[in-house]
Every structure is written in C-alpha cells, then in structure tokens.
Amino acid sequence: MLYPILEQYDVNREKALAYGFVALADTLCLQKALEGTEFYVKVTIAGRRLEVNVFDSDTDEEYLPFNVPDNISGYVMSVREKVEALLAELKEQCLVKSNVKLQLLDYCSQT
C-alpha cells in the first residue's frame, strides 16, 4: 500500500539508516515485526514513494486484507493501527518537513 506522506516530508537518510533501514541502491528498506501479531511489516522508500506491505511471519506471504481499504474487520483494523503507529514513529525519527518555499526558490535560481 502506498502512503503519500513523502509529499510533505523528506527522508533524512542518516537517521533512517540509524533507525534500522537498509540501503539498497536508491532504495531504503525496513523490515520490522508488528508486536502482538504474527506479522511483520516491510517499509520501502524509493524517491518520493513510501510503500508498506504486511507479511505473515510463518509463511512469508503477504497479508492481503491489509491492502483492502473497505475491509474494516476488527483484526485488520488492529493491524492497521499498529502499522500507523510505526509510520508515526518513522515520521518522527526519520523524516523532516519539506520546505517547499526553499525548494521553489532553489529551482527558480537554477533556471
């Protein structure tokens, strides 16, 4: 599932690597267990794309109900809440607010 959070934030690569991300070419990847569940989450950051996938720890198969927005069963919602909490932590630890004004001024000065 794609998250649009990187439209407003930039990744601090050093902080992301310190947090536990692994650098693979131009991509940052994180794999972390979701506490209290039998799942783990893979977070992939490539450019301005942040992708989150949830997998079963025993079978390594993707937990597809997580990706269905209309699925509001209690268990799926609890998994989503844990993922959202992880994303909030990542936002606090690894991301910095984009300064659009400075980016525009920089772009204008280059043209």
Roles of regions detected by a PLM:
Residues 1-4, 53-111:
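Intrinsically disordered, low-complexity regulatory regions enriched in serine/threonine/proline
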Residues 9-49, 60, 111:
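Ser/Thr-rich, low-complexity intrinsically disordered terminal regions
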